[in-house]
Amino acid sequence: MREPSKFVFTAIALIWLMAFPRPGAAQALQEIRIGSSVIGFSSLMSYFARDLKFFEREGFDAKIIYAQTNVGLAALTAGNFDYSNLTTSAVEATLRGMPLRLIAVTNAEPLWGIVVRKDITQISELKGKKLGVSSFGGTSYSAALYVLKHFGLRPKEDVTLLATGGTTERIAALKHASVDAAVIPAPGDMKAEQEGFKILMDAGAVYKLPNGGMSTTVTKIKQNPAEVRRVVRALVQATKFFAEPQNKADATKYLTRVFNLDASSTEEFYRRFVPSLSTNGVVELDKIKLIVDGALERGLITKRVEPETLVDFSFVKGL
């Protein structure tokens, strides 16, 4: 009887390896492209999910790609990005007709410090003074309008709003006395504090709109709901992990590395940041309504839109 050939043994071995891969053998990861306009508190959980391999555990090679807000939203709509970690801007784009949906929220409220000179002790003292924002029509502008009105001040009439640029430029405007106060996102507001200014309050204490999460296209939701659910699951699990007290050492280590903070600043940022997180991936629809109200006030839209038409939180249910 003839002995089996080496070819037969090789074929059997290959079949065996394919049927029973080695434990821990690498599986091919699916690349997803996530647009991001900034590395800040609002986008942090998507970077955290990537860097601590929450996306990888769901089978993804997550590429986070920088793009200015309008460019990133256009790329998302065109299919060049699969997802975006923009929330408020994505909802506003949907209001303007882009076929997008907010699918998960990581930050239930923004961390925008109202940074002032040390002699200013309350918001009412901003009457007759100048307040710096990033740009007219941006989210920090909306926050400024809301906070001023909340405390009985009339924007423009009582307080002059000036578009002074990014965080560095707003701090410089404070130092040069071009403005008396500025809306500055954390942890930049803490850096301004180190320059001799004071964080009077967090705008998010009264202006509670979502400011971090994940958005995608209606087409992606319809054509690949299983992928969307896995992306959302990775993001929500990362956010839960970050917020759990037993993981504080990992969370603060990450904050220190990303934002180049000293120990005391890291501790303070962590103290402010964790309560702002949404660990279940959703916010109430009245918070989405704040975005609609802001868009109406700034003239981005001319008629009211129901908040539930702008989001799809079905993917976070049951996680």
What kind of region is each of these model predictions?
Residues 89, 168-258:
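Pocket-lining segment of extracytoplasmic ligand-binding domains
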Residues 20-26:
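Sec/Tat signal peptide C-region and signal peptidase I cleavage site
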Residues 43, 52, 73, 77, ...:
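Extracytoplasmic/secreted envelope proteins and their assembly/folding machinery
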Residues 27-166, 170-176, 180-186, 199-208:
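Short, glycine-/small- and polar/acidic-enriched structural segments
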Residues 1-10:
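Bacterial N-terminal signal peptides that target proteins for export
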Residues 222-302:
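Secondary-structure end/capping motifs
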Residues 292-319:
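Conserved C-terminal helix/tail region of periplasmic/extracytoplasmic solute-binding proteins
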Residues 9-20:
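Bacterial N-terminal signal peptides
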